[in-house]
Every structure is written in structure tokens, then in C-alpha cells.
């Protein structure tokens, strides 16, 4: 059985991770965060990609697509090998640019089906405030204002066009993510129910 994928996109701090946790609990999806996979890989002492990933993340740049896709593919294969019923995936924070999208379509064409893009739409200032708040406890090196402003620029220049492209294909489900966690999840449930 092929993996069934929902891409979860939105700016930094739009609530992707928080909402994904709830979708997992209620709908039995497996949540794969491209960012978390990259951060975990970066920490592995024997990783072939570790230092490369570190330098990209530190500079607020997008990691080369081959690395991200190979980590996503490996994670999906492992999950499905462990439990054949676990074939529904939320992929959060990917594809983040044109290169990501082309890489996915080149590598995963026929190997996975994308149902839709779940787009958490949130204004920049709300996103920044949430990230600064999260940064106090998360220990994430990129949750500081300077890094965040770069990440938001990268998002607007690179990821928004991907969302627009999926919109043209009729594959975007948009949620106003500036509301409270519960209000946002109510809207999310309307999409998944």
C-alpha cells in the first residue's frame, strides 16, 4: 500500500506542530516533521549529513531536497514496515520551495499519494510572538527575532508560491491559524471529518 500524504504548511509559529499532534490523536495519522527529522539527523554522531544540515539550519537556509526526501522516505518506510495499517502521514514543513516540490515529484511520483495541503494561514507578527514565546522553553536555536525574520522572508518568498501552486490544483485546505488552539482545531476537524 502506498503512503497517503497530507502536506502541512504555514509560517514559523503558525501552529503546525500543535495541530498535527491533535490530528494524530484523533485521526490516526503519523506526523513527520521535516524540520525535526533534519534536527535529529544533525545530532547523530555518525550521520553522513550532520554537519551539512547544521550549516544550512544555522544560516536559516533550506536544506538540499535530496537529504530531506531521503529522511522522509526512510521514516515512512520504517513506520509502514512496523505497522502496515499506518499508511497515513502528515508531513509538516515540506515542500518549502520549488526545488522541494520538484524533488518530491521526481522521487516520490507513484510511490506516495498527496491528498491535499493543509495550510495554516497566520499573520507574521502573531507567528513571531508565538515563536519568541516558544523559544523561551524550546531551546531551539532558531527561535530568536533575527532568525525568525529571515525564516519568515524565506517562507514568503519560497513556500507561499508552492501553496499558490497547489491552490491552482484545487488541493489546498486553508485554516485561519491566528485563533486559539481549540478554535483552529475545530476548523481542522471540519476538513478531516
Curated annotation (Swiss-Prot):
CMP binds at residue 100. GO terms for cellular component: cytoplasm; nucleus. PROSITE patterns: ADENYLATE_KINASE. Pfam families: ADK. Residues 133-143 are annotated as: LID. Residues 33-63 are annotated as: NMP. Catalyzes the phosphorylation of pyrimidine nucleoside monophosphates at the expense of ATP. Plays an important role in de novo pyrimidine nucleotide biosynthesis. Has preference for UMP and CMP as phosphate acceptors. Also displays broad nucleoside diphosphate kinase activity. This is UMP-CMP kinase. The gene is cmpk1.
Amino acid at each position: 500500500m502506498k503512503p497517503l500524504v497530507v502536506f502541512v504548511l504555514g509560517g514559523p509559529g503558525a501552529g503546525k506542530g500543535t495541530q498535527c499532534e491533535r490530528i494524530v490523536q484523533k485521526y490516526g495519522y503519523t506526523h513527520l516533521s521535516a524540520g525535526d527529522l533534519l534536527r535529529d539527523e544533525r545530532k547523530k554522531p555518525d550521520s553522513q549529513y550532520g554537519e551539512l544540515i547544521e550549516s544550512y539550519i544555522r544560516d536559516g537556509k533550506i536544506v538540499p531536497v535530496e537529504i530531506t526526501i531521503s529522511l522522509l522516505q526512510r521514516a515512512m518506510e520504517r513506520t509502514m514496515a512496523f505497522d502496515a495499517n499506518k499508511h497515513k502521514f502528515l508531513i509538516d514543513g515540506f515542500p518549502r520551495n520549488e526545488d522541494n516540490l520538484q524533488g518530491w515529484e521526481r522521487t516520490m511520483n507513484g510511490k506516495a499519494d498527496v491528498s491535499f495541503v493543509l495550510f495554516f494561514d497566520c499573520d507574521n507578527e502573531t507567528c513571531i510572538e508565538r515563536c519568541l514565546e516558544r523559544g523561551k522553553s524550546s531551546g531551539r536555536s532558531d527561535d530568536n527575532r533575527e532568525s525568525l525574520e529571515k525564516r519568515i522572508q524565506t517562507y514568503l518568498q519560497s513556500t507561499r508560491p508552492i501553496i499558490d501552486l497547489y491552490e491552482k490544483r484545487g488541493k489546498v485546505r486553508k485554516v485561519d491559524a491566528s485563533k486559539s488552539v481549540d478554535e483552529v482545531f475545530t476548523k481542522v476537524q471540519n476538513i478531516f471529518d
